[in-house]
């Protein structure tokens, strides 16, 4: 995310700031290759880059997930305060539909997008019926990798295996949204991500 702020460098912090900026640049260079990868399954950074390149500065983005929201925070630039909404690092999953409906009511006519993990979608997906019934246009994009990513990968790193961190792969969440009165589309290739962006109501 980008924020506007002013800072007056101090002599004792210059070396530290130079080091931090150098490391940040190296990280951005590493990320660039991943953001442009055509690999299948789609890497979350490529997924988020496609979203970033489409959005305008008046789009409210609601993050609801683990890994996918972490990647989104690195890749998607938000230039206005209050246009990135999530419950924070100690918040809970499942808040996005309420946030998104409130954003659409507060800013009628502006784009509202939910960036979902598949686990988070399982906590509030039925609320698409509420958005359809109240005619609140919200676009939702689900990173569907079939795992609780922020549970599985730390468990494997710490204890060597994962417990209760799997979801059923390949669930057709797009069909669920259609059953609730919305529009759904499945996208499996990076080059089709833009084609899978109809900007229709949920």
Feature-to-residue mapping (PLM):
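Terminal amphipathic helices with adjacent charged low-complexity linkers/tails
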Residues: 1-18
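Alpha-helix initiation/capping motif
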Residues: 9, 37-40, 166
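Active-site diphosphate/adenylate-binding microenvironment
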Residues: 22-103
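Thiamine diphosphate
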Residues: 1-5, 70-72, 76-202
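A general, composition-driven signal for non-globular sequence regions
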Residues: 10, 24, 28-32, 128, ...
């Amino acid at each position: 995310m980008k924020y506007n702020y002013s800072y007056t460098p101090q002599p004792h912090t210059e070396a530290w700031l130079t080091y931090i900026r150098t490391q940040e640049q190296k990280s951005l260079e590493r990320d660039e290759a991943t953001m442009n990868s055509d690999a299948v399954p789609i890497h979350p950074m490529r997924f988020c880059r496609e979203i970033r390149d489409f959005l305008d500065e008046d789009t409210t983005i609601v993050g609801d997930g683990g890994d996918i929201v972490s990647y989104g925070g690195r890749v998607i630039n938000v230039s206005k305060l209050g246009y990135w909404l999530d419950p924070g690092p100690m918040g809970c999953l499942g808040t996005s539909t309420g946030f998104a409906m409130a954003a659409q009511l507060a800013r009628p006519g502006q784009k509202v997008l939910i960036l979902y993990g598949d686990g988070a979608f399982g906590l509030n997906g039925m609320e698409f019926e509420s958005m359809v019934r109240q005619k609140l246009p919200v676009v939702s994009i689900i990173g569907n990798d079939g795992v609780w990513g922020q549970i599985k990968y730390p468990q494997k790193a710490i204890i060597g295996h994962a417990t209760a961190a799997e979801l059923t792969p390949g669930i057709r969440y797009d069909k669920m949204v259609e059953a609730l009165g919305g529009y759904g589309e499945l996208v499996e290739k990076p080059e089709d991500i833009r084609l899978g962006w109809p900007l229709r109501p949920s």
